[in-house]
């Protein structure tokens, strides 16, 4: 990926050594950041893989109100996309249409901010802890035969 980015003259930063679960410093004194420190600086978050879990990383990008480019993997297609999230997506490979859509979105931050806010509200509606709690209570009640 590094070589490909270099060939295309695309600035990409790989910061795995400096992004951890907790803030701190490395042995040589460099700062260690968290994802919460990094997300606000991303122009776009990408999920190019064809196999993903439910979408915790997707929800993180929504929480931090970032533009999202996602491969149309099966769980996204079935469980996330139908909720109405505004994303840029592709089916298995990046086409010229995908590239043009990304360029257009990056040139119109007012549009991507609107999408991000809509996505945030949709996530609150469908995937918040309150919703999780209600659904778990219902499942437990079904198993036990009474409300807890």
What are the residue ranges of the model-derived segments?
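Nucleotide-activated donor-binding/catalytic signature segment of Leloir-type glycosyltransferases, i.e.
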Residues: 1-37
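Short glycine/serine-rich donor-binding loops of glycosyltransferases
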Residues: 35, 55-58, 76
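A short hydrophobic beta-strand element within the catalytic core of glycosyltransferases
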Residues: 45-46
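Aromatic "clamp/platform" in nucleotide-sugar-dependent glycosyltransferases that forms part
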Residues: 50
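Donor-sugar nucleotide-binding helix/loop cap in glycosyltransferases
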Residues: 61
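Short hydrophobic beta-strand element within catalytic cores of glycosyltransferases
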Residues: 67-71, 87-88
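A charged, aromatic-enriched C-terminal amphipathic alpha-helix characteristic of glycosyltransferases
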Residues: 107-141
């Amino acid at each position: 990926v590094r070589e490909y980015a270099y060939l295309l003259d695309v600035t990409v930063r790989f910061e795995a050594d400096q992004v951890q679960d907790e803030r701190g410093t490395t042995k040589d004194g460099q700062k260690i950041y968290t994802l919460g420190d990094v997300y606000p600086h991303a122009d776009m978050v990408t999920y190019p893989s064809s196999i993903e879990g439910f979408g915790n990383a997707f929800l993180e990008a929504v929480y931090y109100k970032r533009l999202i480019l996602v491969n149309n993997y099966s769980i996204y297609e079935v469980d996330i996309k139908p909720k109405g999230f505004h994303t840029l997506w592709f089916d298995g490979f990046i086409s010229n249409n995908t590239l043009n859509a990304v360029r257009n979105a990056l040139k119109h931050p007012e549009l991507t901010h609107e999408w991000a806010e809509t996505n945030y509200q949709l996530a609150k509606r469908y995937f918040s802890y309150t919703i999780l709690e209600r659904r778990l209570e219902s499942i437990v009640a079904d198993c036990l035969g009474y409300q807890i």
